[in-house]
Amino acid sequence: MARDMFKRRRYCRFSAEGIKQVDYKDVDLLKDFINENGKIIPARITGTKAKYQRQLTTAVKRARFLALLPYTDKH
């Protein structure tokens, strides 16, 4: 119960900023949802709603395919 007191409420960044569609060309936005290894951060950590998480996943995969984002980190 004490642990619940210190948790911050997560919010959906896309809903708060009024973004309707996640664009694969917006690389700066997509980088915020990818960890240092190149993996997509899950919605339970970022607080993104399911609708936008699906769009985000598709956008990241498209950006990777077009070489806008790396598949993995630089080893």
Swiss-Prot record:
Gene Ontology CC terms, in alphabetical order: cytosolic small ribosomal subunit
PROSITE patterns in alphabetical order: RIBOSOMAL_S18
InterPro entries linked to this entry: Ribosomal_bS18, Ribosomal_bS18_CS, Ribosomal_bS18_sf
Protein's UniProt keywords contain rRNA-binding: yes
Any Pfam family matching the protein: Ribosomal_S18
Keyword Chloroplast: no
Gene Ontology biological process terms, A to Z: translation
PANTHER family given in the database record: 30S RIBOSOMAL PROTEIN S18 (PTHR13479), SMALL RIBOSOMAL SUBUNIT PROTEIN BS18M (PTHR13479:SF40)
Assembly notes: Part of the 30S ribosomal subunit. Forms a tight heterodimer with protein bS6.
NCBIfam families: S18
Family membership noted in the UniProt record: Belongs to the bacterial ribosomal protein bS18 family.
Protein's name in the database: Small ribosomal subunit protein bS18
